[in-house]
Each structure stands twice: as structure tokens, then as C-alpha cells.
């Protein structure tokens, strides 16, 4: 029984017009609302639209009203019931005699013994119906899908508006609204069922649940946009029909005969038989159900659209089977463990849980066969690369089902321990499981709740498939159960992984080998994938490079180039030994020839052309030819770069030499976080009683807005800086840098002169507290003495010369009048020192001892001075003025705070910088003290800072 189905996604439903009147109550065109999740929509398959009611097919059975006025296309004659031109039950390509006979018998019992003639066996046919709407010439149906022999109102749809259901009856004169969380039922396990009034005039001929809230009857109709998920049943609610052939004889008011009025006798007579019929019918109907039947569309496209939303929902920890928690369920998500029957989302009619003895034996069988046949139907597409199954259906379909397996011929884990594609299941296998399910009632009921696993299908790129047999996975289906949908195949083996991280972790196993890339056609192995790719051309006979002279073909371009030299006579490789005029067409020949000239180097390497003067040098060279030579085992501890040879690492470390003797290794910490803390400390420490803070200079203001960390300065044993850093030696000329620095410093001096007046006023405001005179215009010679006077206010800091100048940098825009030790006010005069003062301090001879690696102190995380090696890259780390005006191409360099021993109880909130550290930078330009740049040129005291 082939079920033509299609996964509808939002854009399709959003522009799917339906202009047919619904029970003569609507004459307008309806556009369904946008839906971002897939819906398995039942739509008609027909050769052409039928104008007006279809002509009934001759029927051998008594007239039985059907569930909707639908036209049908009957390629093969079959006993089908019609009443007044209305549609018939949908039976698709299968002999349905037994099920139809049982359905007719059930109908006879339900209506009180009315006669019903069993349907005779018939050849396979294809009859499908319109989804809940009469078809006319103006109807536009874009896709086709399966119309099961069940009322269309039980097709699953995602509920809307927090699980609120709006159920519209067939005559559109009443809308019954329910809430899945607030209903009361005598049978808590009864699945949600559509309400039905006792009156026969209130039968649900074509009913649906609107996605929107309850609306007036004139605005409610059933369409593709309706959320058709059965609402909770009231105490007097009843269950819809399980088969459209089981209806009473009332032609005008067809009411399903299996409606439950909670009468035990009636339940036993009607619903028990109906449930058994539905089980057999649904199991047969699931025989050949495809995943997608959209014309001209890749079956995987509908899944890609909603994959991220589904995965995000499952990661929240809410069970997907709880309608109160999630309010929705998908037909591929396994069994339902409570408050919901499997048939609600499996496109089969629901059966009340109050009669589980007749209905619970088949849910898992229906779902398993449905999913198995979905894969079987598209098996050809799988082989062609259109769609690739990734064992998403094998988790719940095989494990813990009490004998209810998929019946796949390939089996689980078949083919080299990998996960095989589930396919080749026959109709007989599905029938077997349907019968087996009837014999394993209790086991299936227990397994239904125990095996309610959450399985979500995932799209797979066909290019990532392992081979013609399907997907091979190192861990079976579990390795491919998650991820974003992409599949990553190992280049060294056939294994496929769902995430790039898993692939990288797996690759490390191969990288332990000297040559992990092994040829599958021969025993050769290679160190990298490119070599293997070139080698594979030999086995495949691929020779893309052809000589235009002799038409000879080659697998590699280098081979062709060498071959062309035989025609041209070109010998580009010439011997450089004095007096030797030989030349060669190939480099290897030149290398071999060069040995004859190395008479002073008797130690020759047998693997290459190199010769050495002594044996230790040769022994050191030989390991370079070992098989693991491609492994980068030598790693730089400063920048993390790795090299294959120790000599390469040594050369690389020389680049760090001029910096490693001045700074410690990389320390953890976020520059942005530390800068933010410093800015917060600067803003939060301002005392309103001290008056408004002085306006910052433009450069510092821009620096604060950019959120850059403050400048760090630390001691060094050298009294000079390199004029051009090793990393930027080729970027700028030393003279140009000096000239640009000179211009920048002149701009800085002008800014400082404007700032001095405001700083002096601020200093007068604070210094009466401590008796310290203002220091804005003091000669440079007195600056050090005044700083030593301030040092007496910090007796807890040892050694004595240490004094914090952090307020100059960490808090450039606000006076620090509320420091914890009470000495923040006296530092305000130095908030912006004039340029001559800063120059003098920078020119003071250093008293700090030589750099000692053992004296490196750990930088605290609360320091306002961020190690510059943790800042952003150079040219961007100090962009406190526009990049066009920033000519400094140096790398920012940071040094350790060597002798800072402060008491946390009485110290500033941030780490302090001692006077020794400031003195140590005798040749730093003035721009550094203002935070403009770190590196400059070496100048002596008293010289201009050019």
C-alpha cells in the first residue's frame, strides 16, 4: 500500500491557495499561515480536477456514507461506497478484502446489526481523496500525498497558541475550544479526541482544528493550515471513526460508528473490532510510505528547514512526549509513554485508551513498519545520493521492542561494524510484524513506554557518504545521532562522524602513525593526504597532464615539467661550485653531483645529497629522514607554533629572544575583561564631593570609549628599546618611525598644556587634606623628591622606593577620591603630569637589578594593567587614535611587575606600579606615559624625544 506523502514546510503552506467553498459557508480564497515545521499533509493524487461531484463508482456493498465530499480518481474498478457523489474510503494499491470485510462487519455491529456485505477481493488500485475539501476546477493542489482510509481530521498538526485547540465541526455552526492542560477526563490515559455532540446533526463530516484561537463559526474552516491534533476529550467526548467504511446508515448525518460514549457494552461491540481493523489496515498502509513525494524537490530539503529548531527544543530537557510541556509531537520521535496514542501522530485514527486491550498491541508495529517502508521506498534514491539514512530510525525501532523489529534485510551494524542503511524490507515482513504484534500485546505495551526514545531525523550531505553500501560509522547509529546534519568522513579511513570535533579527535589516532594515509589498492602509505591523492591517480589511470610534443601523459605536473626538459634541452639546475660548469635538468641530479665537490665533508648522508664535516653532525641530520618527520612535535611555549625539527623551533625562538628576556610567558586573562574592570574602577571611584572630574584629553577619551586596556610598563635591564621590532622590521623604516613619533609627541604636548590648568585646580582641591603642595609646574628635578614624599604615605609597600603611579593610567578621566586607603587624593596631581615631568621620570637612571627569569611574578587578575601580550594584535591594540594617525608598527611588549609587595588590606584596589618600574624606561618617549604607544627610540636624558 503505497502512501504518497510530502513534508510541507512554511513557504509551501504559506502560498498554498484553496478557493473551494467549504460546506457552502465560505466562498473566499484561503491562504494558510506560514509554518516553519514540517507537516505530513494528505493531498489528492488525480489525473485532473473534477468539476462538481464525482460520479460514484459501482458498489457491491450497501451504501455507506463517507467522511467527506471528495472526488476520486479510480484507475481500476473496485467496490467503493458513494453517497450522493461524495468521496470514498481511500484504499491504495493493496488487496484490502480482509480489512474491508472486518470493517463492514464492525459497521454492522455498531449500527445495531444492520446488514453489511463484505467487500470482495480486488486487484491493486489507487484511489485518493482531497484533504477535507471538495475539489473543483478552480482548486489548486500543488502536491500529492497519501489519503488513508481514515477521517482526515486525525492528521497530525502542530498545535498553536500554547496548546489551545479550536475544533470546528462539520457544519461550521459551533466551535468547541479546549485546552490540553485543563481538561477533565474519567480516563486520564485516553488520548485527545474530537468532541462530538449527542445529536446526529452534530457529526464531524469534515472537521479540523484551527491553528488560531477559537473564532466565530463564520471564520473557522478546515484547511492545510489547520492544526489537526486531536483535542482532549471531555467526559462526554467521543472518539472519531477508525475507518470510514464503519459508519452508520444515515446518509445526511454520517456519524462514525466507533464513537465512544463511555458505554462498556458499546465499547466492546464497536471499538474493539474497529481497533483491530485499524491495526491491520494501518500496518498494511505503512508498507511503502515514503519520506517525501514532492515533485521536483530533494527529499532532504524539507528536513533541513526545521532541523535547528527541533534540536534546540530537544536540548531543553523537556520530554517530547509530554503535550503539556512541549505541546507537539512528531511521527518519527518514537513511542508515546503517556496521555497520547501513537496513532495521533502516525496518521492513523486514535483509539481510546479506555479500550487498550484492542488497540495497544499495534502502535509500535505501525510506526516501525511505516519508518521501515519509508526507507525502502527511497532506497534507490539513497544509492543515488539523493538521501542518506543515518540510522536515526534504528534506535527505537530495534531496541527493546519485544520482538517488534524493523525487519531490515541488512540488519543493524551490518557491513564492517558500521551502520547500514535500513532497507529492502518486504511487505511480508510488515505483515509478519503486524501479526506478531497481535500475539505480543503485553510485551508491546511494556516496550511502548520503555522504548520511547527521542529520535530526530537529520539531513545528510550526500557528498559525505561513505560508499555505495551506505554510511559507515565507528560507533554505529550512536555516532550519527547528533550534530548539525553535516557528516565528516575521515580521510584516512571510511569512518564518518557527525561533528568536526569528533573527527579531529579521531584523527589524532591516525596521526600517531608515521604515514597514516594508506592506499586502499596497495600497501603504500603517505604522510599527508595530497601525496595519497596523487598516488591514487596511478591506480585509477588518471593522467591529466599531457605533453604537447609527444602526447605522453603524466599523473603529476612535476613529471610533465621534467619531461618537457628532455625536449627543450633546458638545464636550469647549475652547479655553483667554483670552476664547475655543469648543469642538470633535474634537481636530484644536481644534488648528487654536488657531493663530489664536498671533499672537506667526508660524512655523507645516504638519504640525501648533504655532506658533513664531522660524524655528530651527520648523526643529528639522519633523524630528519625518519618516517615521523612530518609530525610537528616541537612546540613553542610562547605562541603555540609547532615545527617538525628542533632547529626550526630554535630559529623561531630567536624571534622571541628580544622579548622573552623582557616579558614572561603568556599569562591567562582577558584584556577586555581587565580593561572593563579598570574602567569601572575609574568611574566608580569618583567622589562627587570633590567636584566634577577634569575633562580627559581626546586621545584618552577615545581610548576609554574603545574599551582598550591601560598601558603596562615594567622593569627591564636594558636602557634602550629596539628601534624596529623583529616582527615589523620590514614594515617601516626607522627614520620614518622617529619622524612620526616626533610629530605625535608634539600633538601630545599641546593636549597636555590644555589639561594642566584643570589638573592644577583639581590638585588644589585635594591637597589640603594631606598638606602636599600642587605639582603641576614643578621643575623636573623636584619631581622625584615629591614622589618620595608621597612614598611615606605608603609604608606598607616594600622596598621603600616603590610608589604607585597607577592612577595616571587606570583612572585617566576621574579623580580617585574614594580609594580604600585614603591616599587616592594625593595622587590626583599626578593624574596628568606635564610632559617635562614625565620625561624626567622616564630619564631617571634605573636602579633595578638585571632581569631574572625567576623573579617573574604572577600578574593578578584584578590588575588594571593588562599584560600586553594578551592584548589584541599590534596595530590594533593601541588604536586610541585613528589608524591613519598611528604609524607605530611595533608589537606591544609587556614586562613583569618585579618587586610589588603590597598589602591587600591597605592597598589600592588595583595593582600598583613602582617608581623603579617607571624609572627603568629612561628612553621611553612621552607618548608612552600618556598611553599613546609603547615602543619608541632610545634617547638620552635631556635630549629631545625624537
Curated annotation (Swiss-Prot):
C2H2-type ZnF: 488-510, 517-539, 545-567, 573-597, 603-625, 634-656
GO terms for cellular component: nucleus
Spans annotated as Disordered: 10-30, 156-269, 683-853
Key words, A-Z: Metal-binding, Nucleus, Repeat, Transcription, Transcription regulation, Zinc, Zinc-finger
Ranges of biased composition (kind: Polar residues): 161-176, 198-230, 242-269, 813-822
Tissue: Isoform rn and isoform roe are expressed in non-overlapping domains in the larval imaginal disks. Isoform rn is first expressed during the early third larval instar in the leg, wing, haltere and antennal part of the eye-antennal imaginal disk. It is observed as a ring in the leg and antenna disks and in the presumptive wing pouch and capitellum of wing and haltere disks respectively. In wing disk it is expressed in 3 concentric domains in the wing pouch. In late third instar, expression of isoform rn in the leg disk is no longer evident, but is maintained in the other disks.
PROSITE patterns associated with the record: ZINC_FINGER_C2H2_1 (PS00028), ZINC_FINGER_C2H2_2 (PS50157)
Biological processes annotated in GO: cell fate specification; chaeta development; compound eye development; imaginal disc-derived leg morphogenesis; negative regulation of DNA-templated transcription; negative regulation of transcription by RNA polymerase II; regulation of transcription by RNA polymerase II
Record field: compositional bias (Basic and acidic residues): 828-841
Keyword Nucleus found: yes
Gene Ontology terms for molecular function: DNA-binding transcription factor activity, RNA polymerase II-specific; RNA polymerase II cis-regulatory region sequence-specific DNA binding; RNA polymerase II transcription regulatory region sequence-specific DNA binding; zinc ion binding
Subcellular location: Nucleus
Keyword Metal-binding tagged: yes
Segments of skewed composition (Low complexity): 177-188, 739-762, 770-790
Chief localization: nucleus
SUPFAM superfamilies to which the protein is assigned, alphabetical: beta-beta-alpha zinc fingers (SSF57667)
One Pfam family in the UniProt entry: zf-C2H2
Family: Belongs to the krueppel C2H2-type zinc-finger protein family.
Biological role stated in the UniProt entry: Transcription factor involved in imaginal disks development. Isoform rn is required in the wings, antenna, haltere, proboscis and legs disks, while isoform roe is required in the eye disk. Together with nab corepressor, it is involved in the initiation and maintenance of wingless (wg) expression in the wing hinge, by limiting the expression of wg to this compartment. Also required for the epithelial-mesenchymal transition branch of basolateral junctions signaling.
Assembly behavior: Interacts with nab; which acts as a corepressor.
Protein name stated in the entry: Zinc finger protein rotund
Lineage: Eukaryota, Metazoa, Ecdysozoa, Arthropoda, Hexapoda
Amino acid at each position: 500500500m503505497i502512501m504518497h506523502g510530502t513534508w510541507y514546510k512554511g513557504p509551501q503552506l504559506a502560498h498554498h491557495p484553496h478557493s473551494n467553498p467549504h460546506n457552502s459557508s465560505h466562498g473566499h480564497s484561503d491562504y494558510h499561515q506560514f509554518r516553519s515545521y514540517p507537516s505530513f499533509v494528505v493531498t489528492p493524487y488525480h489525473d485532473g480536477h473534477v468539476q462538481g461531484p464525482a460520479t460514484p463508482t459501482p458498489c457491491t456493498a450497501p451504501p455507506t456514507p463517507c467522511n467527506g465530499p471528495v472526488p476520486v480518481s479510480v484507475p481500476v474498478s473496485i467496490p467503493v461506497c458513494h453517497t450522493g457523489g461524495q468521496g470514498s474510503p481511500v484504499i491504495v494499491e493493496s488487496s484490502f478484502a480482509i480489512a474491508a470485510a472486518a470493517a463492514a462487519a464492525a459497521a454492522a455491529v455498531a449500527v445495531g446489526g444492520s446488514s453489511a456485505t463484505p467487500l470482495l477481493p480486488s486487484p491493486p488500485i489507487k484511489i485518493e481523496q482531497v484533504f477535507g475539501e471538495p475539489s473543483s476546477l478552480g482548486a489548486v493542489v500543488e502536491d500529492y500525498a497519501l489519503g488513508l482510509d481514515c477521517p482526515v481530521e486525525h492528521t497530525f498538526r502542530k498545535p498553536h497558541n500554547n496548546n489551545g485547540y479550536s475544533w470546528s465541526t462539520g457544519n461550521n455552526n459551533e466551535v468547541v475550544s479546549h485546552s490540553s492542560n485543563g481538561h477533565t477526563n474519567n480516563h486520564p490515559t485516553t488520548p485527545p479526541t474530537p468532541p462530538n455532540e449527542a445529536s446526529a446533526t452534530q457529526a464531524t463530516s469534515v472537521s479540523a482544528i484551527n491553528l488560531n484561537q477559537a473564532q466565530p463559526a463564520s471564520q473557522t474552516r478546515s484547511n492545510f493550515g489547520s492544526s489537526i491534533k486531536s483535542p482532549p476529550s471531555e467526559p462526554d467526548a467521543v472518539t472519531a471513526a477508525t475507518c470510514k467504511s464503519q459508519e452508520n446508515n444515515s446518509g445526511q448525518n454520517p456519524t462514525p460508528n466507533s464513537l465512544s460514549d463511555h458505554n462498556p457494552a458499546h465499547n466492546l461491540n464497536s471499538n474493539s473490532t474497529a481497533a483491530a481493523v485499524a491495526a491491520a489496515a494501518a500496518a498494511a498502509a505503512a508498507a511503502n510510505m515514503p519520506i517525501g513525494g514532492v515533485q521536483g524537490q530533494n527529499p532532504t530539503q524539507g528536513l533541513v528547514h526545521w532541523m535547528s529548531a527541533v534540536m534546540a527544543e530537544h536540548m531543553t530537557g523537556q520530554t517530547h512526549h509530554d503535550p503539556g510541556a512541549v505541546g507537539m509531537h512528531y511521527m518519527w520521535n518514537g513511542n508515546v509513554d503517556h496521555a497520547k496514542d501513537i496513532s495521533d501522530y502516525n496518521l492513523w485514527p486514535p483509539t481510546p485508551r479506555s479500550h487498550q486491550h484492542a488497540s495497544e498491541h499495534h502502535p509500535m508495529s505501525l510506526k516501525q513498519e511505516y519508518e521501515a517502508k519509508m526507507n525502502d521506498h527511497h532506497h534507490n534514491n539513497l544509492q543515488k545520493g539523493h538521501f542518506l539514512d543515518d540510522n536515526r530510525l534504528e534506535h527505537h525501532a530495534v531496541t527493546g521492542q519485544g520482538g517488534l523489529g524493523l525487519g531490515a534485510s541488512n540488519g543493524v551494524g551490518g557491513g564492517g561494524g558500521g551502520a547500514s542503511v535500513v532497507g529492502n524490507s518486504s511487505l511480508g515482513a510488515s505483515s509478519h510484524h503486524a501479526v506478531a504484534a497481535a500475539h505480543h500485546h503485553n510485551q508491546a505495551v511494556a516496550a511502548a513506554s520503555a522504548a520511547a526514545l527521542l529520535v530526530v531525523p537529520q539531513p545528510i550531505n550526500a557528498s559525505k557518504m561513505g560508499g555505495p553500501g551506505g554510511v559507515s560509522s565507528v560507533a554505529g547509529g550512536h555516532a550519527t545521532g547528533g550534530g548539525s546534519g553535516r557528516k565528516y568522513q575521515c580521510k584516512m579511513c571510511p569512518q564518518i562522524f557527525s561533528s568536526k570535533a569528533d573527527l579531529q579527535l579521531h584523527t589524532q589516532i591516525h596521526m600517531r602513525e608515521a604515514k597514516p594515509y594508506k592506499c586502499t589498492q596497495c600497501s603504500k602509505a603517505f604522510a599527508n593526504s595530497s601525496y595519497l591523492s596523487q598516488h591514487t591517480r596511478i591506480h585509477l589511470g588518471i593522467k591529466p597532464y599531457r605533453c604537447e610534443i609527444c602526447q605522453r601523459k603524466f599523473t603529476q605536473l612535476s613529471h610533465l615539467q621534467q619531461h618537457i626538459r628532455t625536449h627543450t634541452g633546458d638545464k636550469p639546475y647549475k652547479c655553483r661550485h667554483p670552476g664547475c660548469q655543469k648543469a642538470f635538468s633535474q634537481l636530484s641530479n644536481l644534488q648528487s653531483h654536488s657531493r663530489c665537490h664536498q671533499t672537506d665533508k667526508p660524512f655523507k648522508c645516504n638519504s640525501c645529497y648533504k655532506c658533513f664535516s664531522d660524524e655528530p653532525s651527520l648523526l643529528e641530520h639522519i633523524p630528519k629522514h625518519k618516517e615521523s618527520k612530518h609530525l610537528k612535535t616541537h612546540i613553542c611555549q610562547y605562541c603555540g607554533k609547532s615545527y617538525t625539527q628542533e632547529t626550526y623551533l630554535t630559529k623561531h625562538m630567536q624571534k622571541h629572544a628580544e622579548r622573552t628576556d623582557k616579558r614572561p610567558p603568556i599569562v591567562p586573562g582577558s584584556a577586555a575583561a581587565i580593561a572593563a574592570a579598570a574602567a569601572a574602577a575609574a568611574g566608580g571611584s569618583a567622589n562627587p564631593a570633590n567636584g566634577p572630574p577634569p575633562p580627559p584629553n581626546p586621545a584618552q577619551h577615545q581610548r576609554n570609549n574603545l574599551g582598550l586596556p591601560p598601558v603596562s610598563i615594567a622593569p627591564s635591564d636594558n636602557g634602550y628599546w629596539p628601534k624596529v621590532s623583529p616582527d615589523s622590521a620590514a614594515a617601516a623604516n626607522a627614520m620614518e618611525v622617529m619622524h612620526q613619533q616626533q610629530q605625535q609627541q608634539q600633538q601630545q604636548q599641546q593636549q597636555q598644556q590644555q589639561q594642566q590648568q584643570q589638573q592644577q585646580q583639581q590638585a588644589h582641591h585635594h591637597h589640603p587634606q594631606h598638606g602636599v603642595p600642587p605639582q603641576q609646574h614643578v621643575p623636573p628635578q623636584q619631581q622625584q623628591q615629591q614622589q618620595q614624599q608621597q612614598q611615606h604615605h605608603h609604608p606598607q609597600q616594600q622596598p621603600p622606593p616603590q610608589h604607585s603611579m597607577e592612577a595616571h593610567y587606570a583612572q585617566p578621566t576621574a579623580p580617585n577620591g574614594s580609594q580604600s586607603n585614603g591616599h587616592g587624593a594625593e595622587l590626583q596631581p599626578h593624574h596628568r603630569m606635564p610632559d617635562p615631568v614625565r620625561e624626567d621620570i622616564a630619564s631617571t637612571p634605573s636602579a633595578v637589578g638585571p632581569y631574572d627569569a625567576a623573579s617573574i611574578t604572577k600578574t593578578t587578575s584584578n590588575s588594571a594593567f593588562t599584560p600586553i601580550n594578551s592584548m589584541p594584535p599590534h596595530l590594533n591594540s593601541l588604536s586610541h587614535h585613528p589608524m591613519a594617525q598611528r604609524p607605530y608598527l611595533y608589537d606591544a611588549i609587556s614586562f613583569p611587575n618585579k618587586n610589588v609587595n603590597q598589602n591587600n588590606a591597605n592597598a589600592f584596589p588595583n595593582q600598583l606600579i613602582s617608581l623603579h618600574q617607571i624609572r627603568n624606561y629612561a628612553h621611553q618617549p612621552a607618548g608612552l606615559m600618556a598611553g599613546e604607544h609603547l615602543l619608541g627610540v632610545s634617547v638620552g636624558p635631556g635630549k629631545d624625544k625624537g
